Swiss-Prot record:
Coiled coil: none annotated. GO terms for molecular function: 16S rRNA (adenine(1518)-N(6)/adenine(1519)-N(6))-dimethyltransferase activity; RNA binding. The lineage of its organism: Bacteria, Bacillati, Bacillota, Bacilli, Lactobacillales. Belongs to the class I-like SAM-binding methyltransferase superfamily. rRNA adenine N(6)-methyltransferase family. RsmA subfamily. InterPro entries: KsgA/Erm (IPR001737), rRNA_Ade_diMease-like_C (IPR023165), rRNA_Ade_Mease_Trfase_CS (IPR020596), rRNA_Ade_methylase_Trfase_N (IPR020598), rRNA_adenine_dimethylase (IPR011530), SAM-dependent_MTases_sf (IPR029063). It comes from the Bacteria. The gene is rsmA. It is an enzyme of class 2 (transferase). SMART domains: rADc (SM00650). The keyword Glycosyltransferase does not apply. This is Ribosomal RNA small subunit methyltransferase A. Its EC number is 2.1.1.182. Specifically dimethylates two adjacent adenosines (A1518 and A1519) in the loop of a conserved hairpin near the 3'-end of 16S rRNA in the 30S particle. May play a critical role in biogenesis of 30S subunits. It catalyses: adenosine(1518)/adenosine(1519) in 16S rRNA + 4 S-adenosyl-L-methionine = N(6)-dimethyladenosine(1518)/N(6)-dimethyladenosine(1519) in 16S rRNA + 4 S-adenosyl-L-homocysteine + 4 H(+).
């Protein structure tokens, strides 16, 4: 396996990126949300943040022309890169020809049989980290698909729209806090590592990006009686952010006297005021609320 760092120009150097795209006659597709990073310092920082070494396998999503893949391959045991755009497969074969520890899988990550795919690693027992520059338009579905999968991904270091990274890592009583924060933080710790300006991409997106580091918890943050119901309660509590918890709950469950009586009992059991807003409740509070509402028959 070749792990020596390249001494010549990087794929991410702007002149190299442009030459590769021109040589292959590549044009960007908006439908794939393609923005290629052209800053080698940021790429190195991503690898450092992910703490990639020879004892780690990496799954990359959306390798593009291989700018990040190059850095990952120099450090990881193996890299499995999922690329949905079949036009990029021959380009990746060209740009990554010096590496024998990279597998390019021409498939949508949401449709891939990951349990089968990870067995293709030479050493599938090594910890697996996900490192990716995620397309803005499908960031959340990809993340939740991977987080909720049965595969014990140890860590995620992913680039995404800054606003989404802020929402995922947000704490209660902040504007960004919501059901997405809860859905991710139930399983993972989440912290914004650093900001990536829009100016370092080709083509430049309309907003800045952020690198979000997420580490899987040994166990979910809290224990709840019914996970699906817990996530349902957290989601419906933010449907109308400026409305009280009571208004959101009655909008969802109904306003009959029987329902309102059960809601009152559940809120009292969880020791939560009906007049509070969802953004003021911690994940632990939502766990207590969901369990209490379940207990009273909702």
């Amino acid at each position: 396996m070749i792990i020596k760092r390249r001494e010549y120009m990087r794929i991410a150097d702007y002149s190299v990126t442009k030459a590769v795209l021109d040589r292959h006659g590549f044009t960007f597709k908006k439908s794939f949300g393609q923005n290629f990073l052209t800053d080698t310092n940021i790429l190195q920082k991503i690898v450092d943040t992910a703490e990639i070494d020879q004892n780690v396998n990496v799954i990359e999503i959306g390798p593009g022309i291989g700018a990040l893949t190059e850095f990952l391959a120099e450090n990881a045991a193996e890299v499995m890169a999922f690329e949905i755009d079949d036009r990029l497969v021959p380009i990746l074969a060209d740009t990554l020809r010096d590496f024998d520890n990279v597998q390019v899988v021409n498939q949508d990550i949401l449709k891939a049989d990951l349990q089968t795919q990870i067995k293709q690693f030479k050493n599938p027992d090594l910890p697996i980290k996900v490192v990716a520059n995620l397309p803005y338009y499908i960031t959340t579905p990809i993340l939740m698909h991977l987080i909720e999968s049965k595969i014990p991904f140890q860590e995620f270091v992913v680039m995404m729209q800054r606003e989404v990274a802020d929402r995922i890592s947000a704490e209660p009583n902040t504007k960004a806090y919501g059901s997405l924060s809860i859905a991710v933080q139930y399983y993972m710790t989440a912290k914004v590592a650093f900001i990536v300006p829009r100016t370092v991409f080709v083509p430049a997106p309309n907003v800045d990006s952020a690198i979000l580091k997420m580490v899987r918890r040994d166990q979910p943050l809290i224990e709840v009686k019914d996970e699906d119901f817990f996530f349902r309660v957290s989601r419906l509590s933010f449907v109308h952010r400026r409305k009280t918890l009571w208004n959101n709950l009655t909008s969802h469950f109904g306003k009959s006297e029987d329902i309102k009586t059960k809601l009152e009992k559940g809120l009292a059991l969880a020791d939560i005021k009906p007049s509070i807003r969802g953004e003021a409740l911690s994940i632990q509070d939502f766990g207590k609320l969901a369990d209490a509402l379940k207990e009273v028959g909702l």
